[in-house]
Amino acid sequence: LNALRHRPHIIIGTPGRLLDLYNQEAFKLSNLSLFVIDEADQVYSTGQSEEVNQLRNAIQGVQTICLSATKNAKIHTYFDTPFEEIFQGEIAVNEKITSYYLETDNKKDTLPSLLHTLPITSAIVFVNHRSTAIELSDLLLRNNILSSAFSGYFDERKRIAIMSDFRKGDIRVLVATDAAARGIDIHELSHVIHYDIPIDTETFIHRSGRTA
C-alpha cells in the first residue's frame, strides 16, 4: 500500500486483489495508458473474468493487451469490439526437447526408479491434485531424492521459499500442481514429467514449456 501511494509507473497484481485495492481507492486509474492481461486464456476460463471486466469498465478507452502462449476462443466473447491479434502463429515444436511416453502398471513405484536413472539436473513432476503432490514428495524423500510439493493452495511465503530452494538446487525435484505450469522461469530445468495427464492440451503446452 505504501508503494501505491508513491504513484508507481506499473502496478502488477491478481485481478481480485487489484479490484479490491481500487475499490478501497488505494490507487486511481484516471491516468492509465495501458492495461495488460497476462495468461489471458486462463483468466477468461476461470472465475477471474468478472474482476477483470470490472476493472476494464473503469478504464474505458484504454488499450488492452492480452498475452498468452495458447489461445482460447472464449476471450473474444468478453470484448465488445474485435481486437487485433498482433502476433498469431502455430505452436512450433522445440527441437531441443525430447519427449518419451512410458507405460507402467504402477507409476508410483516407477517414479523414484526413473528419477534415479535419468541424468536430471532438476525436474518438475506435474500432478493434478495437491494431495498427490504431497504424497509423491514424501515418497521421493523416502527414496533419498530431494523434493518438495508445490501447490497454489500453499500460502505465498511458503511458495516463495520452495521456489527459492528449487532455484538454488536445494530441491532437486518439484512435485507440483498446475500452479507451477505458467509464468515460472526455472533455469537449468532438465526434465518435466507429466505424472498425471493434464485435462487439456493448453495445460500440457504450458507444463512442457517450463523447460524452455
List each language-model region with its residue ranges.
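Conserved helicase RecA-like core
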Residues: 1-212
